[in-house]
Structure formats: C-alpha cells, structure tokens
Amino acid sequence: MKHIFIAIVCLLGSMSLQSCLHDDKEFFDESAANRIESTVENTQKILESSENGWQLHYFTGKGMTGGGYTFLMKFANGKVTVAGDAAIADPTERVTSSYTVDRSMGPVLSFNTYNNIFHFLGEPTYGEIEGDQGDWEFVVTKLTEDSIFVRGKKWENEMVFTRIPADLDWTSYLNSIADVQKRLGVNYRVGNSTDASKMIEINSSKRHILSRKANGQIVEQPFYVTTTGIHAVNEPVVLDGNEVQDFLVSPTGVLSAKDNEALTLKTYAPSIDTWIGNWTLSAMQGSCDITISKVEDEENMLKGTFTTGGYTYNIGLDFDPETGNLNLPSQMIEDPSDRYPALWLMNADLNKGALLGNGGMNIVWHGVAQEGDFEDDGTVADRGNVTDTFIALACTSKGEPITKDDKYIFVIEWYFLSNLTQNK
C-alpha cells in the first residue's frame, strides 16, 4: 500500500511539473514572438527613418579575412538604393533593389533582389566558387537610433550601419575615397630601409596590407579606404616597433601614421634585376618553371623561357622602370615543335569566354611577399573585359588562327594566371 501511495504522489508531481513547464513554454514562446515581431518592425522603421541613408563598412571573408568596403544605402518603401567604393561601382552610380526584414533567425535584414553594386562580392566566379565570401543577409544584433549592429548570416562578420549626416553629399564623399584609392602605391618603406620589418605592401585589389614580423612571418590584414587614408581592420599594423591602425595618404601618395605623422613611408620601385632568375609561374590548372633573363641590346626588355609538353618556348616581357612591374602582352611566338608556322600567345577573359588578342597582364611586384602577381593591365576595360588568361593558338605565318574540325587549336593554356614566385 505504501508503494502504491508513493507511486501516486510521484505521478501527480510529474503531471504537475509537466503542466507548469507547458505553461511556462507557452508564455515564453508568445512573449519571444512578440519581442521579435516588435524588433522587426522597429528595425524597418529605423532603417527608413534616415533621410540621407546609412553607411556600412562591409567586410568579406570568414573572420574578416577579406577586404573592407564602404557602401551607402537609402531605405524607403521596401526598396534600397546603393552606392559604394567597390571596383565595380563608379562614385556617381546608384542601383535600387528590394530588401526585407524578417524573423527567420531573429530579425534578419535581407537584400533579396539582385543589386550589382552590392551582391557581386558574394558571387561565384570560375576562380573562386565562393566569390569574395560576402554576405547579403544579416542578423540584426542591436539597435540604436544612429547605429544598427548586424552579423553576416553565412560568414558571420560583425558590421555596423551608421546614420549618414543630412548634409553629406554621397558623390563627393565617394569621390574623396576614390581619390585616395588612386594615390595608393604597392610597395612602401621607411626611408631607404631594406629591413623587411620597416616595409609594408598594399594590395588594393584585395584590400590587404602585408607586413613582416621580426622573425620573418608575413602578416596579412584587411583594410578599408577612408576619405583621408586607409584603416586597418582587426589589428593594427606593427611597423618599425610602432602600432598603426590608420594611415593618412598625402596628395603624392606618401603614407603617414595618423597618430604619429613623423612616421612616414614612401613608395619604391624594384629594379629590373629583381626579375632576373628562376621562377614558378602559377595558374588555375597548375604551374611551370620559367627563367627570366635580359634581352641583349634591348633596354627594359626581358625574355621568359619555359618548357612544357617536351618543348621549350620563349616569350617577351616588358619592364616598366617607373613602377618596377612587368607586362606580359599578347604576342606572336615561335613554335619549337615546328608543327605550326607560328603561335599567337593571346590574352583572354575566361569569365566571359572571350579571346581578346590585344592588351595583356601586368606582373606587379609585391616586396613583402617577394612575388609578382598577375593583374589585368586595363587595355580592354573599355570593351567591358578583364584579362585573366593566356592561350597560345596555332597560327599561319600571317597570324591567322588554324582550325581543326572548326575549332581553334590550343597549344598552351594558362587559365586564371596567379603569380610568379621565386625558386630557391
């Protein structure tokens, strides 16, 4: 009997506990839903309350390892108008698309229709399946009247929308940023120092600052451009024993530490001898060894010699003494196999599937990394193309492509050329 009584008491207690838990759960769910709905409404209200819009310092790459960008956005009636300093956008360009604020993971701000100024940082390309790892959906984590704190839904970078003052002109502001971008060089050093710890490297296309620690380790930090200079994201740059978060950029491109303007850095250009030697040329599908040497009696001309498929080829490279960079142009070269009268080493835009035939790629020296990176030289920009690839086509002696079964014959294929690294 005693055992039966204990069992009944336990059963009643369990039922009572379940009932209480059930009541609490219903109460919590209801209040949480109300709170989220209220936050959603408040987020949209605050977004559309700014007459001159919001500024967003936007970061790509997981853990903010990519570049930093500035976007200006005006929200109204479910639409958002965007301008920005990304390479794809002119300071005067504006693109309008739609946006939503929903409660899928708490309040989520979503740019739910395509905006070419904003979305391209997250778009996949042939070379990068995840693009630049950019978000266009953001979990709202905190709201004030002048700031909206968000976290990227996919890449989880923390960012802040800040209210733009009513008297700030968007075009003038973005033009000031663009002017700073144009003044940025690549290789900087304190004085004439050859000490790597007194040098930095600016990679404007990736928005990265590279520096070296005393032990030789390379440190890579993202930055965004301001109207007066550049701001290092995450950690300050350590340079000659000084920590620098912000660099000012002078009209002549000289860098100075914002908090210590006596610390200045000037650009330097590598000499032609920097390029002489043995290198590894890397592209998407692999790499090959290439030897670079001077061309006799030809000032600022170099020759690249490499072997592939059992044959040794020679290509021409132009040296620019002002920048210290090389240029790989589209050119006719000899076919060492004697199968064809000539080969046309032709530049191409692989992203658009276009053979171009004029222009080429610069090989930009990066002093901290001690490598040369391939970049489009801008020749075909007015056609809407970007050179990222070189292909050698079989040709007649007059430069006319030879075909087989109505297709061009590709002898050399360098897809998405990446860099030159020194062989040790």
Describe these PLM feature segments:
Residues 79-220:
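Long, acidic/polar, low-complexity amphipathic helices and coiled-coil-like
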Residues 339-403:
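C-terminal structured domain segments
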Residues 21-108, 143, 166-190, 414-423:
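Acidic/polar, low-complexity intrinsically disordered N-terminal segments immediately downstream
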Residues 158, 164-282, 293-297, 305, ...:
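Preference for solvent-exposed, low-hydrophobicity sequence contexts
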Residues 110-133, 229-242, 334-357:
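An anionic, turn-rich surface loop/hairpin at beta-sheet edges
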Residues 15-19:
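C-terminal motif of bacterial Sec signal peptides marking the signal peptidase cleavage site
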Residues 2-10:
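Sec-dependent signal peptide recognition
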Residues 61-106, 194-231, 285-332:
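N-terminal glycine/threonine-rich, aromatic-flanked beta-hairpin/loop signature
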